[in-house]
């Protein structure tokens, strides 16, 4: 599978230091280490740090909102927000809807399941694998592995919980995010 690319999507935001402005960013904040919500109910992570650095550079103020992943592009198109800062693959379909910056992070994807239960994708035939709704991970499984039942989730956090509780057999997600999960489990 093509490596995952993270990108900033911009809609009508002129990134110049000529006038102080507020840039309204949206993300799906259950995606550590890129985006998550801390103990103070604040959105934090790599993408937030990058957005804040961008705002500092252009003398703007950043605000962040948490939304379902599959609502990010519609929110941008309807100008409810100014930019998306989230782990989002650049695809031809998405490029028809929004503008992307140059990618700033490459990532791969992997399956994770109960320890020692599955050692190959072939063993997931007929099994339920969680994916985040609207992602290229979902499309990849549906297109390349129709023998696997995809279970869409609004967040990878909910897929992780269902995996831990035995309601699904695996999760297919970004390597960096899954690695963060495995640190805690």
Q: For the regions a protein language model found, what residue spans apply to each?
A:
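Short Pro/Gly-enriched coil loops immediately N-terminal to beta-strands
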Residues: 28, 98-110
């Amino acid at each position: 599978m093509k490596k995952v690319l993270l990108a900033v999507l911009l809609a009508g935001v002129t990134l110049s230091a000529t006038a102080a402005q507020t840039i309204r960013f949206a993300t799906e904040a259950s995606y550590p280490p890129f985006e998550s919500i801390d103990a103070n109910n604040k959105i934090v992570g790599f993408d937030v740090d990058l957005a804040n650095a961008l705002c500092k550079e252009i003398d703007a103020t950043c605000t962040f909102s948490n939304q379902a992943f599959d609502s990010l592009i519609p929110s941008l198109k309807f100008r409810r927000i100014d930019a998306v800062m989230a782990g989002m693959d650049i695809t031809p379909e998405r490029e028809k809807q929004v503008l992307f910056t140059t990618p700033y992070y490459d990532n791969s994807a992997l399956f994770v399941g109960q320890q020692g239960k599955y050692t190959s994708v072939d063993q997931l035939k007929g099994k339920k694998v969680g994916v985040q709704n609207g992602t290229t991970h979902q499309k990849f499984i549906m297109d390349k592995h129709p023998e696997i039942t995809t279970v869409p989730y609004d967040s990878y956090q909910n897929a992780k919980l269902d995996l831990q509780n035995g309601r699904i057999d695996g999760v297919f997600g970004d390597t960096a995010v899954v690695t963060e999960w495995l640190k805690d489990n």
